Amino acid sequence: MKVAIVIPSDINSAPYLQYYADVLKRKEIPYYFISWNRKGSNDSLLCENNIVYTLESAETIPLYRKYIDYMCFSAFVRKELENGNYDFVIVHTIQASLFLGKYLKKYFNNKYIIDIRDYSKLLIIYKSRFHKYLKCSALNCVSSPGFLSWLPGDTEFTVSHNLRSDSVYRDYKYVLFDKKIIRILTIGQLRDYSTNSRIIDAFGDKNSVLLHFAGNGNAKESLEELVLQRKYKNVVFTGRYRKEEENDIVERADFINILLPTGIHDVNIMSNRFYLAVIHRKPMIVNEESIQARYVEKYRLGVVVNEQDNICEKLMQYIDLFDADLFNEGCDLIKKEISSEILLFEKKVESCFS
């Protein structure tokens, strides 16, 4: 057997590909990535087992150009599948599934997996077509149960967390807050100005709080300008970081900020920050509209705020009433739940190759 793992982006930007690779390695099944080098980088060309389609395609290009670029990538994938004698396909994203769906349905019926980790506006037009492709797959996976709110209700989906199984079992110890300085970390892409500026204005004039923003993004420059305008002295931007630095950055924090926009995608995702907070046992700040708030409330993992709340007051109340035993118990319980769902995902993927 030979498996193709299709991703319409650079494989270095998609760590979740390894969840499938882990299973295939255990079963000693040969596999190849078929990826799209959209930024013209040479990094992906050096990766093992990676068949690369190179065409620069920025996120900001017009919609018709995106359509043409996806058509070209899909043609490249079809040609590789035909010439490479593949037996099974794992295709990531709704967009790639739609462009390849007709071909997969005809030549790989019940021999492909659709993996969904993002919402796509293409579903507004092509929802019924996508439904057909889901019905003809061997397995359908989602990175968040929140996606079920906009996916077909008569189709079975398996949760594939944005986490490898070995990461869940890392045992970090909870460290009590340093009451002199509370360190609130926002880590990862800084895409949204509104939610991040809300955090900055909530704590920007509080000497007892240090706000740390680690990562780049479209909103970073505007947020830095806001801090300068407000003359806040307790906000730090450290920019891009290496993956190997991530654990040390998180360990120095007391809270993880996960306030997100309230669009259909953002309220339904399980963010990487959420998993970092759980693994490192760091209380988190989430907005009540998000699916992450359900877990935070159920397992007592932090502070849930709405649009009217005074975030600073809620955080200080949480600290005053904080029970370390209850918090650690909640971390243990959610890690157990995540572990069981990862095990179920791996078993279902393995069953596709039995």
Place the predicted regions along the sequence by residue.
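A charged, aromatic-enriched C-terminal amphipathic alpha-helix characteristic of glycosyltransferases
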Residues: N306-E313, I319-S354
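Donor nucleotide-sugar binding/catalytic pocket of nucleotide-sugar-dependent glycosyltransferases
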Residues: K121, K135-K179
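N-terminal subdomain of nucleotide-sugar transferases
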Residues: M1-G40, G84, L139, D201-D205
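Conserved donor-binding/catalytic core segment of Leloir-type glycosyltransferases
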Residues: V6, C141, V175-T195, I199-K206, ...
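Membrane-proximal helix-turn-helix segments that form the acceptor-binding/catalytic region
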Residues: D22, S74-K79, L98-K102, K106-Y107, ...
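N-terminal strand-loop element at the rim of the active site
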Residues: D10-N12, V23-M71
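Nucleotide-sugar-dependent
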Residues: S194, E244-I249, I256-L276, I285-R294
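Nucleotide-activated donor-binding/catalytic signature segment of Leloir-type glycosyltransferases, i.e.
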Residues: E221-D248
